[in-house]
From Swiss-Prot:
Molecular function terms, GO-annotated: carbohydrate binding
InterPro entries: ConA-like_dom_sf (IPR013320), Lectin_LegA_CS (IPR000985), Legume_lectin_dom (IPR001220)
Keywords: Lectin
UniProt keyword Transcription regulation present: no
Keyword Methyltransferase applies: no
Subunit comment: Tetramer of two alpha and two beta chains.
Protein name: Lectin alpha-1 chain
Amino acid sequence: VTSYTLNEVVPLKDVVPEWVRIGFSATTGAEFAAHEVLSWSFHSELGETSASKQ
């Protein structure tokens, strides 16, 4: 069995709005394959808003 790991850090605040839904998609073309997400990690830090700076 071949195993692959994908790891990517993306600064989401630069590319998505405040509220989003995250999904996964995978394909192998014409062949059958099972894709499993065995681990998922998400971390969020709220930035300072303009109202809190006053």
